[in-house]
Amino acid sequence: MKINTVLFDLDGTLINTNELIISSFLHTLHTYYPNQYKREDVLPFIGPSLHDTFSKIDESKVEELITSYRQFNHDHHDELVEEYETVYETVQELKKQGYKVGIVTTKARQTVEMGLKFSKLDEFFDVVVTIDDVEHVKPHPEPLQKALQLLDAKPEEALMVGDNHHDIVGGQNAGTKTAAVSWTLKGRAYLEAYKPDFMLDKMSDLLPILSDMNRS
């Protein structure tokens, strides 16, 4: 089956929001729980939804913690977000070649739109599925299924690209092919354990992979 659709995670995949996310967590946690969390403590928080993360820390303050996190995140967004090499050119080329492209993220839509505008990727994506659009987040298949439905695409014709196990397992649960990015903050070996179909060292690696898949 040929691939005609590529779904991307956003944070850590299309745009480098690692420092923004870490700083947002540390600011929020230092405000409410001074001197209890270090940088390495918050790395596991990258990937799950804010609600899932904060509910494990203090269920009575979840909404308050989310509000504090998002306020800092929005205020410092443009100074802390960076672009990844070859991402813009690759997505541009995929669109030019006629691929359907979408984003499946656990972020809130307002923050997603800030990131896409900052990176100038907003012109390429017709379908963006955020946490505001679904009942269940990755690795549940619902967000991917929703994106595929909106793109009028079948799972067996799609590839999910991401930097976290939620993306790889989510793709597997939805029946898509999967590609992990080696620039994940959690390390290449971490993602290899989830057996993605492909490992990308830079985003432009996607182009020959898709070309080979669609030639066979």
Curated annotation (Swiss-Prot):
Q: Which reaction does it catalyse?
A: diphosphate + H2O = 2 phosphate + H(+)
List the keywords (alphabetical).
Hydrolase, Magnesium
- According to its UniProt record, this protein's enzyme class is hydrolase
> Where are the active-site residues found?
9 (nucleophile)
InterPro entries, A to Z: HAD-like_hydrolase_sf, HAD-like_sf, HAD-SF_hydro_IA, HAD-SF_hydro_IIIA, HAD_2, HAD_sf, PGP-like_dom2, Pyrophosphatase_Ppax
At the top level, the lineage of the source is Bacteria
A Gene Ontology molecular function term of the record: magnesium ion binding
**Enzyme Commission code:** 3.6.1.1
Keyword Hydrolase on this protein? yes
Q: State the Gene Ontology BP annotations.
A: DNA repair
Gene Ontology CC annotations of this record:
cytosol
Q: Which CDD domains match?
A: HAD_PPase (cd02616)
Q: Which residues form the signal peptide?
A: none
Name used for this protein in its record:
Pyrophosphatase PpaX
Q: Which organism is it from?
A: Bacillus cereus (strain ATCC 10987 / NRS 248)
Q: What is the lineage of its organism?
A: Bacteria, Bacillati, Bacillota, Bacilli, Bacillales
